[in-house]
């Protein structure tokens, strides 16, 4: 899978790598490529330089760590069931010549009866002419992809659109727990970890990931990495509605709330200036642990800076993070 991105100035682009990795792992893909790492000479600009920047986007870079741990380390199981549809050469030619398929919408399973939500639940594949049929697979008619909660057949990833305008992606695997989307005001009890996101600039939208960096699982670990981030932009960058040109927001450290807008946006190629501003989203985490643990804020190089207070409630160690700590990531470690 190549050339994937949620381009800036998309206000929700902190989700980019996580969304790709979760479903790439579920589909058991061989490789994924974000577009693009950085194609300009100003490699240390300290600001997002264009729509597709990865290397100067703090949250896209930080979330490459849980992305790697999930996808490359194989921390999430591929979907159990495989749904296939056969596409022969003549049918492919007809789809293209009729204009039904085109450069940015090449022939895919949607033309052959596979429901758009099926890949959120099962593995899917096209069987092209000359390819053998898998010994065990389901046809599109054999499966039902009904929502509003699209949970994978492994139970490790779910896309919840119970509120169509406030979707949430949840990953719950042995070494990764992610809550991505409009998650504020809810409590996510994920067996050994409870995540309780709070309100954000984007009306409760944010990214919270917890990854086992040292250890086998959330029952047996020595070190965790927590990322809690949201809106990412450049200082002074103005976001406008694409059609009307109406200003939605001007980025600054004084920004308190953003208009909830579900339409095309643009910065009119005015990318503001350094430094990039990143929202550290507030959340409370409850981690089940039999030993004492400590939590630290991290600087931009990953070094410990400030200790975060932890309280004890039954089997849980509890702490809260947020914008007051002026960081997007934290280390949680078992006390030696």
Feature locations, PLM:
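Proteolytic processing hotspots in large secreted/extracellular or virion-associated proteins
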Residues: 226-230, 241, 246-290
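Proteolytic-maturation and junctional protease-sensitive modules
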Residues: 281-320
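Catalytic-core region of carbohydrate-active enzymes that cleave or remodel glycosidic bonds
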Residues: 1-140, 144-148, 152, 157-159
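Short conserved micro-motifs at the rims of enzyme active sites and ligand-binding pockets
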Residues: 12, 44-45, 236-239, 307-308
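A structural signal for short secondary-structure junctions
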Residues: 26, 217-220, 276-280, 287-290, ...
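C-terminal beta-strand-rich structural cap/linker in extracellular carbohydrate-active enzymes
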Residues: 315-336
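Active-site-proximal substrate-binding groove within the catalytic cores of carbohydrate-active enzymes
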Residues: 97-250
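Short alpha-helical segments and helix-capping/turn motifs at coil-helix boundaries
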Residues: 10-11, 16-20, 209-212, 280-283
């Amino acid at each position: 899978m190549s050339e994937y991105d949620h381009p800036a100035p998309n206000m929700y682009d902190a989700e980019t790598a996580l969304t790709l990795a979760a479903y790439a792992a579920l589909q058991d893909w061989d490789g994924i490529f974000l577009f693009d790492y950085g194609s300009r000479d100003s490699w240390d600009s300290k600001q997002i330089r264009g729509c597709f920047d990865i290397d100067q986007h703090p949250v896209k870079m930080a979330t490459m760590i849980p992305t790697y741990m999930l996808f490359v380390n194989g921390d999430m199981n591929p979907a159990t069931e495989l749904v296939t549809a056969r596409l022969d050469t003549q049918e492919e030619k007809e789809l293209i010549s009729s204009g039904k398929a085109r450069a940015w919408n090449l022939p895919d399973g949607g033309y052959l009866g596979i429901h758009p939500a099926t890949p959120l639940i099962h593995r899917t594949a096209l069987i092209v002419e000359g390819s053998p049929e898998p010994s065990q697979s389901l046809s599109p008619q054999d499966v039902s992809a009904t929502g509003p909660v699209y949970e994978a057949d492994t139970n490790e990833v779910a896309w919840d659109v119970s509120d169509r305008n406030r979707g949430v992606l949840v990953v719950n695997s042995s070494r990764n727990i992610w809550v991505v989307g409009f998650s504020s005001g809810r409590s996510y009890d994920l067996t050994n970890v409870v995540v309780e996101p709070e309100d954000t600039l984007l009306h409760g939208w944010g990214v919270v990931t917890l990854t086992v960096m040292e250890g086998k699982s959330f029952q047996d670990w020595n070190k965790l990495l927590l990322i809690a981030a949201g809106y990412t932009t450049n200082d002074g960058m103005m976001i406008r509605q694409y059609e009307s040109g109406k200003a939605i927001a001007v980025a600054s450290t004084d920004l308190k709330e953003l208009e909830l807008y579900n339409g095309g946006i643009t910065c009119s190629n005015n990318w503001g200036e350094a430094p990039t501003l990143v929202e550290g989203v507030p959340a409370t985490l409850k981690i089940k642990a039999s030993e004492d643990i400590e939590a630290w804020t991290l600087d931009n190089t990953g070094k410990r800076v400030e200790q975060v207070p932890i309280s004890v409630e039954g089997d849980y160690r509890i702490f809260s993070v947020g914008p007051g700590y002026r960081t997007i990531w934290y280390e949680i470690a078992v006390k030696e």
